[in-house]
């Protein structure tokens, strides 16, 4: 094959050589993907439905769960398809799309983790300015910037990678499309562009890492000055899930791409690729839900079917808005007021029936006399 224009498809690395192992890998990947969908889906639903979880920390966690869902849906379905149907093919356009979305979600996740470290820094080191620095508009702008940065990062790398002429076949040494394995098929004069891509990734990655490290150094200094042991424990408990997720994300990705060539082997490379591309989206929801009591309680309420419980009478409701309407019974609030006479009502339906007094409407007629 002389160049990339003559390549119609790529050959992905099979997960196993025998049919029995292929089916086993299919079942394993199916279980992993279902666990990731369940865990991240519960976090998204709990944060979206729980009014008390509408805070900057949980807003960014919701975005992180979305990236994890996209992350695992980019690579695992194709691997499952190939294992089930005993094939290795992926089209040229499909490979480009898979690489684009893989880089998009991994870039957005890294930027979101960086922003979440800033959220922890402000909440612990500058609590009096938390509402100003992390208002709803500021949080929306930062989340949008993370997604946009991931998009631009992915677009740059995908366009540069697939603009290279490919001279060394179409077999990839990976179970999904990844830049290093595509570059191995490129012609020799692509080394300079490869170094340029590596430099851009290194600068962005190192910049985010330095920002995260600086944030946690400042957090550690502030926490150590807290006089009470309970206060220090609460501060550490708040940061620990994020720190664990960041450590898992950075350590696995760094080791995969910077491991010594002397210890490299196809089986080890495959295992490490699964570790950094498939495992984190499954573990991230577990890490956050185990350490955060608010999130754990919200997920449990969501799984019960009637997640919102009235603290006064114990009655349960589907949403926090319905619970709020119900609580007016206990507080004697009457939020719906008639514009004509000013009388207050607990429910809007009662207000509508009352207004018929002023309009002269008679919506309910007797079936016998009208």
Label for each model-derived stretch:
Residues 306-370:
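Recognition helix and canonical inter-finger linker of tandem C2H2 zinc-finger DNA-binding arrays
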